[in-house]
A protein has these predicted regions:
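Divalent metal-cofactor coordination and adjacent catalytic microenvironments
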Residues: 1-91
């Protein structure tokens, strides 16, 4: 995910908290790999990765304002699907 894409997801202008947003973007691939087993190299091929990345980014960025229960349930469901998809890559 690029900084521009992240700013669009978060509905913020570039230049506002760019360092924070970039650090969250940088954390996404390894977080997804750790929680699902889907290697970073395989994440590019999975459309759900972009969706769950946007949701995670929203949850992390707006931690004190996000509707945590509904958003967390959605994120957890998508991470479970990606875990199943990771098994296809891992054999």
């Amino acid at each position: 995910m690029t900084l521009t894409e992240a700013c669009n997801v978060l509905h913020v202008d570039e230049g506002n908290n760019d360092e924070l947003i970039q650090s969250l973007i940088d954390a996404l691939p390894s977080y997804i790999a750790t929680t699902t087993g889907l290697a970073e190299v395989n994440q590019v091929a999975e459309p759900l990765v972009k969706t769950v990345s946007g949701l995670l980014l929203t949850q992390w960025y707006y931690a004190d304002h996000a509707d945590d229960q509904a958003l967390s349930r959605t994120i957890n469901s998508l991470l479970k699907v990606l875990t199943v998809r990771a098994r296809a890559y891992n054999g």
